[in-house]
Amino acid sequence: MGYEEAFFRWAFLIATVYVAYYFLVSSDKKLATKPQKSKLTKLGKQKQRQKQKNTKKDTLVNRETPSKKSQKLETSDALKSKSKDSSKKEPVVVPKKGTPKIFQENHKVKKVKSPKKEKLVGKNPAEKEDTTDVEDTQKLEQKHSTTPSSLKMKSSISLAAITADDSLHNSFSSNDIDDGFQTVTSSRSYGKKKSTEPLTKRQRQNQQKKLRAKEMQELADEEQRRRLAAHRKELHEANRPRGGLNNSSRSAYSYINNGQAGSSKGNRYDSLW
């Protein structure tokens, strides 16, 4: 009886363990499969919502497009009409010299633009348009000028020569003009032209400072010259030739010239000792 009881007990334990293991494994499988299904369902629902939103937007756009197209057409027609109106230019009426004033008042006279100025305006938009009458400059010069062409050429050459000479004589350094001093307008041919405006307090102070600095520089230059002159004098006295054969200031060449250091008769070092 002891063996049978032991066998039944072991069989019961093994069966309970197997049943517990089976239930645990099945529950784990269910937990693993459930979130995947929920995720898939959520993604499907989100896609459906996006599709519904897109369809609503498409319907709204399709409803609004004809009105927008009509607005675009209206704006394009208005622009075309404006461009046509601007392209139509009124004819320019230029009165002759003998026309009366009544004609000029009735017919508005427009001033013709010069072609040269129009080109300049096109290059630089900041410049204003010039509405002066078109007149040939060469013809005006021929009318008003009484000097012949030969004299004109000579005068231009002489002016060029004068300016070249003046630039050599009247050349000024950058130190002559300063921001804090009196304003000076310099030109190549006529030198300097001082302005008639009175000096301010700051300009006067700067001018006084410059004058003081100039005086101090002159004093320093004079002192330097004196020192250099004294130094030159000392050097001259030191290098002056002195009498006597046994003088320490004499050079070796003086002995050779006298025939003492370089002579073969006497002892070479007698005069030195």
UniProtKB/Swiss-Prot annotation:
Q: What membrane topology does the UniProt entry give?
A: Single-pass membrane protein
Q: Name the keywords, alphabetized.
A: Cytoplasm, Membrane, Transmembrane, Transmembrane helix
Q: Where is the composition biased (Low complexity)?
A: 92-101
Q: Where, per UniProt, does this protein localize? A: Cytoplasm; Membrane
- Biased-composition ranges, Polar residues, are 145-154, 245-266
Q: What is its main location?
A: cytoplasm
List every stretch annotated Disordered. 34-154, 168-273
Task: Enumerate the transmembrane spans.
Answer: 7-25
Record field: compositional bias (Basic residues): 36-54, 201-212
A single Gene Ontology CC annotation of this entry is: membrane
Q: What is this protein called?
A: Uncharacterized protein C13E7.07
Q: Which organism is it from?
A: Schizosaccharomyces pombe (strain 972 / ATCC 24843) (Fission yeast)
